[in-house]
Amino acid sequence: MFAPGHITGFFVICKSSNKLKTGSIGAGITIDRGVNVELKEGNGSIFYNNKKVNICAVEKVIEHYKKFGYNDDYDIIFSSDFPLGSGLGMSGGCALILAKKLNEMLNLNENYAEIAHISEVECGTGLGDVIAQYVKGFVIRKTPGFPINVEKIVVDDDYYIIIEIFGKKETKEIITNDIWIKKINEYGERCLNELLKNPTLENFVNLSYEFAVNTGLINEKILSICEDLKFTVGASQSMLGNTLFCISKKETLEDALSILKNPIVCNIYY
């Protein structure tokens, strides 16, 4: 079972006393690399790329399904192209596919995406990834949480998404800080309004760059590389992580790859 990675270009933090309606609005793209899950007989351990880990959102999902008879007779094994904390939605992806898996395993008819979203919100590890990963594609989230209200934009399949990961960033430290929230929401709303007027991939990546720079969230090294990649469709930083993403057409792909040290090439995942 697979969940795609999710690149968030920009977002607005939306808080509510109702966890289902807490989340974010904004825009992002899902990619064809992400995370897979399998369950094996065991003692309830969680593994991510062969390393025993604690993933808060995953633990919340497990807690929920224990009410319906799930027990710790299984180890949960996630495998991914990306590390946790890189701004590519891996925490949300793990929660989403595990909720789907347990829903099927226990023959339940629950809205597993809602369970995963609430788990992420409670842990402070994400606000909108689960919704985008559930819907898939180039997704503009118009209202936070559930019920889902998005605009899916169809784009040509001749775009490549190039990623380079430069390290981790703690989502919770930013989305719970009032100074960051004010900056993020001011520029996020502007970018969302502009994208809705002209919902193209080119406009998305340019607005993502503006958001990253204006909020001050962009890493200096990534900023410098974005300047070098201006011959492509555009480049920015995936929110919230120290990960560069670049959108390129085929004719500029090789030149773009030559600038990066450890590039990962993806396609948009629908």
From Swiss-Prot:
Signal peptide: none annotated. Pathway: Cofactor biosynthesis; coenzyme A biosynthesis. One of its GO terms (molecular function) is kinase activity. It is an enzyme of class 2 (transferase). Keywords: ATP-binding, Coenzyme A biosynthesis, Kinase, Nucleotide-binding, Transferase. GO terms for biological process: coenzyme A biosynthetic process. Disulfide bonds: none annotated. SUPFAM superfamilies: Ribosomal protein S5 domain 2-like (SSF54211). It catalyses: (R)-pantoate + ATP = (R)-4-phosphopantoate + ADP + H(+). Its EC number is 2.7.1.169. The keyword Kinase applies. Belongs to the GHMP kinase family. PoK subfamily. Phosphorylates (R)-pantoate to form (R)-4-phosphopantoate in the CoA biosynthesis pathway. This is Pantoate kinase. It comes from Methanocaldococcus jannaschii (strain ATCC 43067 / DSM 2661 / JAL-1 / JCM 10045 / NBRC 100440). The lineage of its organism: Archaea, Methanobacteriati, Methanobacteriota, Methanomada group, Methanococci.
